[in-house]
A protein has these predicted regions:
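Short beta-strand/loop segments at the ligand-binding rim of alpha/beta enzyme cores
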Residues: 15-21, 63-65, 175-176
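Single conserved hydrophobic/aromatic residue that forms the stacking wall/gate
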Residues: 2-3, 7, 201-210
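FAD-binding glycine-rich core of flavoenzymes that anchor FAD
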Residues: 46-60, 65
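Short conserved active-site loop signatures built around small residues
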Residues: 68
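Active-site loop/helix belt of alpha/beta enzymes
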Residues: 56, 61, 72-199
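N-terminal active-site wall of soluble small-molecule enzyme domains
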Residues: 1-4, 8-40, 47-53
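Hydrophobic residues within beta-strands of alpha/beta enzymes
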Residues: 1-4, 20, 42, 109, ...
Length: 210
């Protein structure tokens, strides 16, 4: 996955020429060295990773804005596989582990708690998260709402999304980012395939020797 990440980010830098943002649960030294040349924003999943690479970011020849992924402890995702806030989750830093010294040098906060959901879920997430992380949000330049926003779905409440963005932007004076990955290509085409062969194999019970 790390190798694919670097290829993707290089494509974003060289082909689109716009801002490149990256997040990973962890970075290897080899890949992080490449990311320093490719990315404008780097989000860390833990303070341990941030501390490991902080000096390299500060010594970089180009300006790189870094943030930390938080775990707000609130999500309405029904399938545990896609729920980053289930007990024992390692995705993001929970409130009780936020640290003054460790936060030094970070510009933003990232959270990703949604999966194919409408903006009412985002609104309730903010209701839960903003009061708890208010102290840290006041120190941020940007906030990333993560993905899972089904913006292009016919019943998606865009006006509510706008209110959510303006609420955070105006309260904390930050730039707001979203990552609606699936929504960009939702119902955008068809997958066409041809069946070339059918192979039906009946496997009998193995012979057991006593």
């Amino acid at each position: 996955r790390q190798r694919q990440m670097c290829i993707r980010d290089r494509l974003g830098r060289e082909h689109f020429g716009k801002e490149v943002h990256v997040f990973s649960p962890a970075y290897t030294q080899e890949d992080f060295t490449q990311l320093l040349e490719l990315c404008d924003h780097i989000v860390f999943n833990s303070f341990g990773q941030w501390k490991k690479y902080r000096q390299q970011v500060q010594d970089a020849t180009r300006n790189i804005s870094c943030g930390i992924r938080i775990n707000p402890g609130y999500a309405e995702v029904e399938t545990d596989l896609y729920n980053p806030c289930i007990p024992g989750s390692r995705m993001g830093v929970p409130l009780e582990q936020m640290e003054e010294d460790s936060f030094a040098g970070l510009d933003g906060i990232h959270f990703h708690t949604m999966c194919e959901q409408n903006s009412d879920v985002l609104e309730r997430t903010l209701d839960h998260m903003l009061p708890q992380f208010d102290k840290w949000l006041k120190r941020c330049k940007w906030v990333n709402f993560g993905g899972g926003h089904h913006i292009t779905r016919p019943d998606y409440d865009v006006e509510r999304l706008v209110r959510c963005i303006e609420r955070v932007r105006d309260t904390y004076g930050v730039q707001v980012y979203l990552e609606p990955g699936e929504a960009v290509a939702l119902n955008a085409g068809y997958l066409v395939a041809t069946v070339l062969d059918l192979s039906l194999i009946h496997i009998s019970e193995p012979t057991r020797h006593s």
